[in-house]
Amino acid sequence: MNVQERRNLNAAVERHTSDHVSWYLSSIGRIPLLTAEEEVELSRKVQLMMALLENPDAESNSENQAVLQAGQRAKTKMLKANLRLVVSVAKKYQNQGLELLDLIQEGSLGLERAVEKFDPALGYKFSTYAYWWIRQSMTRAIDNHARTIRLPIHVSEKISRIKKMTRELTHQLKRLPSRAEIAEALKLPLQDVEMLLSQSTPCTSLDAQARGDDGRSFLGDLIPDPKSLEPMDAMDRHIQHEQISTWLAHLTEREQQVLQLRFGLHDGEQHTLAEIGRRLNVSRERIRQVEARALQKLRVLSQQPLCPEAC
């Protein structure tokens, strides 16, 4: 396949996607917009429906069934009449990881949520309220399913070209192409292709489920906490704690008390010399002297074997 044929194929793929979007826009463009009075009337019917659906004790009689049916018809009418708003918002978030049709689909979910929660008594237009829900749904989708870090538009366009060429070469070669082959086909330096591909790697949420038998493990659970101790480290800490306790036993009661407060040996809370002095009703200088004498004794003890009984 020569360069011109590749360009023709890429153009055909782009036209195919564009045709789908154009058809969709043409379809929703024929749906009439709602007046302010219609919005209020339909929203009230939806509210009545939602109140029944959220009430588990509601009776399933003919009157309630009529309310549910009227509410569903009103909801559908509001959704269809506001799809143009979804498309308008979606266009603002193109080239950030999701295709336009995917953004429209995600935005439609936000629109549905807005229809269900809108209260016309608040006094503002439905489109103002729905815009927030639509935008939130799209941005969450971009973060969760596309990228956490948004790329500049020109970088996203280059990555799209690489992905298209990868599909084309895979079909042509009956295998996955190498990065060098992709770079040659696109007439780009290999290092540029490698850099762009590294940037296109999607970020995975730590809340994503990890494969397992119980289905309840998440990726975040498998990442070690740098603040937690490994078993051997914990054992070392335990031995050190016991050794310090042995050394402290060689000190006077006052010396032990001062070091325990000074270094937080019991509760982890360290105190200043002045604080210890006030607690023990002596001067700050006196506490400093006791601390210095106690530390000197510990230096002597620390030079002895760790387990003199076993040596």
From Swiss-Prot:
Residues 247-304 are annotated as: Sigma-70 factor domain-4. It comes from the Bacteria. CDD domains: Sigma70_r4 (cd06171). It is found in: Cytoplasm. PROSITE patterns: SIGMA70_1, SIGMA70_2. It holds the Pfam family Sigma70_r2. A motif (Interaction with polymerase core subunit RpoC) lies at residues 102-105. Residues 157-234 are annotated as: Sigma-70 factor domain-3. GO terms for molecular function: DNA binding; sigma factor activity. Residues 78-148 are annotated as: Sigma-70 factor domain-2. One of its GO terms (cellular component) is cytoplasm. GO terms for biological process: DNA-templated transcription initiation. Sigma factors are initiation factors that promote the attachment of RNA polymerase to specific initiation sites and are then released. This is RNA polymerase sigma factor SigA4. It comes from Synechococcus elongatus (strain ATCC 33912 / PCC 7942 / FACHB-805).
